[in-house]
Design a protein with these regions (language model features):
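Active-site rim helix/loop that mediates acceptor-substrate recognition in acyltransferases
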Residues: 74-94
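Conserved acetyl-CoA-binding loop-helix of GNAT-fold acetyltransferases
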Residues: 142-157, 180
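Conserved acyl-donor/pantetheine-binding loop and adjacent beta-alpha core of acyl/acetyltransferases
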Residues: 112-141, 145
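Conserved GNAT acetyl-CoA-binding A-motif
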Residues: 159-171
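Conserved active-site alpha-helix within GNAT-family acetyltransferase domains
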Residues: 173-191
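Conserved beta-strand in the GNAT
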Residues: 97, 103-114
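Conserved catalytic-core motifs of GNAT/GCN5-like acyltransferases
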Residues: 114, 188-202
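Conserved N-terminal entry element of GNAT/NAT acetyltransferase domains
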Residues: 2-52, 211-229
Length: 229
């Protein structure tokens, strides 16, 4: 179980979502942190802080061959919980479960890029936000689902902090599928660089481009196909 100190830390860092770099009054673990109804996929996208009750599902996702190929964390439950506990205790990172309607489907880490090791590789602004992501449920995969919920996530991040002008990702450089889908949403590849554990590509999206070109299509309108591909 989480220690009392870790529970306190976890409750406090949730407020980084709403108050930027400052901490505010705590919220209950398990509460919906942010949500957005996405007309493009006609589903409600919501976020909750991960907790111990999510561990079995998280382990199943990490042991999915499609996820393991890029995350390389097909570990035991004990080791997975150690990893998540470290993320929960990190005041600059929010480890989250993403939901489509009532279905938990994704693990997401939203973090302050200027406080992350990524800042050693690009000129990070103080309010740049970074994302790590995986989709664990096969039924929630596919390009239209991705366009919808990723647009909602980007919108929620920008709305949480008006000073955030950029969102960045650093996927493995050979993750062509993810980079193609992110490019559709305005996240352009800037350059490649080396982390100790991978060759990475820096993807970057901006607030201005997102609201001028992306959100009106994938965040505010119904999909023209009328179905999920």
């Amino acid at each position: 179980m989480l220690s009392a100190n870790l529970i306190k830390l976890s409750m406090n860092i949730v407020n980084l979502w709403a108050s930027g770099l400052e901490q505010d009054k705590p919220r209950e673990m398990g509460a919906v942190l942010a949500e957005h109804h996405n007309p493009y996929i006609n589903k409600r996208f919501s976020l909750k802080l991960i907790e111990r009750a999510d561990l079995a599902r998280f382990c199943r996702w990490m042991n999915d061959p499609r996820v393991e190929q890029f995350w390389q964390q097909a570990w035991s439950e004990e080791k997975q919980w150690q990893y998540l506990s470290e993320k929960l205790a990190d005041a600059h990172t929010l480890p989250l479960i993403g939901y489509l309607d009532e279905q938990p489907f994704a693990y997401l880490e939203v973090y302050w890029a200027a406080k992350d090791k990524l800042a050693q590789h690009y000129d990070a602004a103080p309010y740049d936000r970074g994302i790590h992501l995986l989709v664990g449920e096969q039924s929630c995969r596919g390009p239209e689902n991705f366009r919808g919920w990723m647009s909602s996530l980007s919108h929620l991040i920008y709305q949480s902090q008006p000073l955030t002008q950029r969102i960045v990702l650093e996927p493995r450089a050979d993750n062509a599928r993810l980079m193609m889908r992110m490019a559709e949403l305005g996240y352009d590849s800037q350059f490649e660089f080396d982390f100790p554990h991978k060759r990475a590509a820096l993807l970057m999206g901006t607030r201005a481009h997102f609201y001028e070109q992306i959100f009106t299509t994938f965040g505010e309108r119904k999909s023209p196909s009328g179905h999920l591909a």
